[in-house]
Amino acid sequence: MKAIVVPGPKQGYKLEEVPDPKPGKDEVIIRVDRAALCYRDLLQLQGYYPRMKYPVILGHEVVGTIEEVGENIKGFEVGDKVISLLYAPDGTCEYCQIGEEAYCHHRLGYSEELDGFFAEKAKIKVTSLVKVPKGTPDEGAVLVPCVTGMIYRGIRRAGGIRKGELVLVTGASGGVGIHAIQVAKALGAKVIGVTTSEEKAKIIKQYADYVIVGTKFSEEAKKIGDVTLVIDTVGTPTFDESLKSLWMGGRIVQIGNVDPSQIYNLRLGYIILKDLKIVGHASATKKDAEDTLKLTQEGKIKPVIAGTVSLENIDEGYKMIKDKNKVGKVLVKP
């Protein structure tokens, strides 16, 4: 089969012919229907993921159809449409037992210790699998593990959303931001989308209740109302304004961190005196994925796709990811 393989640290990637995977105990083989490109791929190629075992197939977001099942597989069968978590938990530890699989000490990451999904077929451990409800588009399902489900989890850990709560999303036109708007609205929020582009603002207005254009957005946000939740999909460049935007008792779900070398000098006074909470994210759990798939199936979250590329044209996909004019997510169809 064809696959995108990373041969070693900082050695880029290659399109190669590799043997078809075979299922072991507690594993299935899927036909990859869609995968997705991510900024994380670029960070992996730059050497920021020390757990990678080489050579390894790149890609950590997937939806596919089961073609083979190994021994001990229960609850899944050939023909099932599934997604995978970003990692394979052991399924037995205390964290797995309470539904926080992302905290599993023995988890293995796809596109890290395990082969990923930029391939015609993929091998997935049963502990990673989540069934996709009938009628859910592939383009929406593939976004759940690392985009919509991750956002949902961050909001859940930040205490959820009250009906009518005012939420601000930075990087609102990006692959994460445009979907963060939709997740927040699906949960009952009013949403402010922030962008630096007048052209992108026209598109964001189709999803957000309010749009602010510019890098200094906190004062404009305050004129709209009391922002009590920020979903920051950018990182260091927007974090200070995100803090300033929040009213007393507010929360930030911090998702963006495009450049790990950037350091932010945190002003503790903002956190203490405004009684703020900062929430990170470790990717979706099975329950988060199931809940988000349901919202997607119901049409409350609609995938916004900037483009779809083949394995042979994956270079074009990465050019699209780096293009600041794109809106939405870039997918791979093997």
UniProtKB/Swiss-Prot annotation:
Molecular function (Gene Ontology), one example: acryloyl-CoA reductase (NADH) activity
Alphabetical list of NCBIfam families matching this protein: AcrlCoa_red_Thmprot, PRK13771.1
Record field: transmembrane: none
Enzyme Commission numbers on file: 1.3.1.84
Annotated catalysed reactions: propanoyl-CoA + NADP(+) = acryloyl-CoA + NADPH + H(+)
Protein name (Swiss-Prot/TrEMBL): Acryloyl-coenzyme A reductase
List of residues binding NADP(+): 39, 173-176, 195-197
SMART domains the record matches: PKS_ER
Pfam families given in the database record: ADH_N, ADH_zinc_N
CDD domains: Zn_ADH5
Cofactor(s) the protein needs: Zn(2+)
